[in-house]
């Protein structure tokens, strides 16, 4: 099922406290909130941001961590804002992209050039106190990221692989583990069994990888640019996928009346709750 249309929808997160799903529309500078009714996202409200918003991550107290260009901000329920820091970027044409709060309590945020310049991107870890640590450099489109145990799995869009790193408080260590993707990888999430679900930009589908890197299932999406994923609902059994109108020609738009929508499906698989404590 599809509902609501985004230019560049990204970053779906389920909040088990408010029982709402949040997403961002990056270039429209807006955060959208949805209820789930019979597994379908129903739009309830939205609020504007002050910059292009790569991610809006809900915290337990009702706040959101906003990644606006290079600025990291906490937005409180009454609408007031607290600036945490500016990510110390080199270059002016950069913006935040995908981000999540890690199991270490820090914000992990990817940064890219607006024109997707090769090697201009990076991945950062940001603490609540504003400390910034660069984890990876020479990226192009830092996209999906998630953790399983002491493993960090990550994609850089033009590199058609999901790569595994060992992570600790000192940083990341590359491993030999990597899964090949059939298409441009975008957002990803682990399910409760430790298997990866990956949105594929330009492929109108989501692929399910087992622990050996084999694609064991694919889900068609009625929008070619599927962008990001999460599991939602009381039992975390509803897979939600955002999508985008961005970079789509008129002929393709005509073939996909639900282009840019947000989609949901019950696949009989459960996910895990998002990290929601920012330290």
Task: Label every model-predicted segment.
Residues 36, 60-62, 76-77, 124-131, ...:
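Flexible "stalk/tail and boundary" regions
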Residues 230-279:
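Blade-level signature of beta-propeller repeat domains, shared across WD40, Kelch, NHL, RCC1
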Residues 1-3, 40-47, 82-89, 131-137, ...:
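A short beta-strand motif characteristic of beta-propeller blades
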Residues 30-32, 71-73, 121-124, 161-163, ...:
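A short loop-to-beta-strand structural motif that recurs across blades of beta-propeller domains
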Residues 37, 165-171, 267-272:
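Short loop/turn segments immediately following beta-strands, especially the blade-tip
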Residues 14-16, 21-27, 59, 64-70, ...:
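Conserved beta-strand positions in repeat-built beta-propeller and related beta-rich domains
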Residues 79-135:
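Hydrophobic alpha-helical segments and helix pairs
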Residues 3-18, 48-64, 89-106, 135-152, ...:
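Beta-rich, blade/repeat-based domains predominating
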């Amino acid at each position: 099922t599809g509902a609501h249309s985004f230019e560049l929808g990204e970053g779906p997160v389920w909040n088990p406290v408010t029982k709402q799903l949040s997403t961002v529309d990056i270039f429209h500078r807006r955060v959208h909130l949805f209820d789930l009714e019979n597994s379908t996202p129903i739009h309830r409200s939205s609020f504007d941001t002050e910059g292009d918003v790569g991610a809006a991550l809900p915290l337990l107290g009702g706040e959101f961590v906003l990644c606006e260009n290079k600025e990291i901000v906490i937005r409180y329920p009454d609408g007031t804002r607290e600036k945490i820091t500016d990510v110390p970027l080199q270059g002016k044409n950069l913006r935040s992209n995908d981000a999540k709060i890690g199991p270490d309590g820090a914000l992990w945020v990817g940064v890219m050039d607006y024109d997707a310049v090769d090697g201009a991107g990076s991945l950062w870890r940001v603490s609540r106190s504003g400390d910034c640590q660069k984890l990876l450099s020479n990226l192009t489109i830092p996209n999906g990221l998630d953790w399983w145990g002491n493993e960090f799995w990550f994609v850089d869009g033009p590199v058609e692989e999901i790569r595994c790193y060992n992570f600790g408080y000192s940083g990341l260590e590359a491993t030999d583990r990597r899964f090949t993707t059939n298409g441009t990888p975008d957002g990803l999430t682990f399910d409760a069994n430790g298997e990866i679900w990956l949105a594929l930009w330009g492929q109108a589908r989501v692929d399910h990888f087992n622990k050996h890197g084999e694609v064991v299932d694919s889900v068609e999406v009625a929008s070619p640019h599927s962008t990001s994923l999460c599991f939602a609902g009381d039992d975390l059994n509803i897979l939600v996928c955002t999508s985008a109108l961005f970079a789509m020609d008129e002929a393709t738009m005509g073939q996909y009346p639900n282009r840019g929508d947000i989609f949901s499906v019950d696949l009989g698989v459960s996910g895990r709750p998002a990290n929601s404590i920012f330290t």
